[in-house]
Amino acid sequence: VDVLYGPWPRHHRDVTLAEVRRRLEHSPVGGALALSTRGPLFDDRAGNEETLRDLAGCPELRPVGTVDVRDAMTAEDRLDELAAAGVRFLRLFTAEQAAEPGFPGYRRVVELALARGMVLLHDGDPRRYGPPLMGRGADVVFLDLHAYLLADFLLMAREEPGFRVTTRMLSGPDSVERVVHSVGARHLVFGSRTPFMDISPSTLRLRYADISDDERHAVATGNVEELLS
């Protein structure tokens, strides 16, 4: 759920869409949610248009949209454009755009996105961004939850059926199992942050986790398919 292509700060070079597709092709991952980094880094409208245009010929990739939370006055137009294009997922880049959970622009973007039934792909610390999203019926996938912070997420997930976390940073020996056995497999989705991280550790952790085959399938594909429906 967290595939990017294009330039990225602190990364040694641009990674083209073609290269990302090659990496996925040579991995166990058969499909992904992706977007161009032009949207969060330079121009949200142009970036969304680029993502839709580029991914139109990539059947294994589903487009993700974004908006610039620093310019929430234009967010409504951007979200309407994404909805018209059938985009279900909105990725927020609060770190790159210096957006705190209490900022007016952030609150406005979230309000507009939830009103349109969009799924938030959310960066940052869930301990900070999760509580303001509780009690709102939100579908949120937290992308940056570290294994050390898992207990706080589990407490929120007990109350929020729409809160999910990716496997990417759940590096503890039983992190995947803790999520599945504590709150259910529906709260976990596969994530690797291709191409900026090696995809192998995430796939191996999921493959050998002590969970049932049905739970493994839900984490790998089923939960995202449900969000797409």
Question: What is the meaning of each model-derived region?
Answer:
Residues 3-4, 19-42, 60-66, 87-95, ...:
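Divalent metal-dependent hydrolysis catalytic cores, especially in the metallo-beta-lactamase
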Residues 2, 24, 51, 55, ...:
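Conserved, mostly hydrophobic/aromatic
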Residues 1, 33-36, 64-66, 91, ...:
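Active-site neighborhood of phospho(di)ester-bond hydrolases with catalytic His/Asp-centered motifs
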Residues 1-3, 13-31, 200-229:
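Mid-to-C-terminal alpha-helical segments outside catalytic/metal-binding sites
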Residues 19-23, 47-54, 78-82, 105-109, ...:
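A general structural detector for well-ordered alpha-helical segments in enzyme core domains, enriched
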Residues 45-121:
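Active-site gating/metal-coordination segments in enzymes
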Residues 102-189:
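Catalytic pocket-lining loop regions of alpha/beta-barrel enzymes
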Residues 6-9, 39-43, 70-73, 97-98, ...:
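Active-site environment of divalent metal-dependent phosphoester hydrolases
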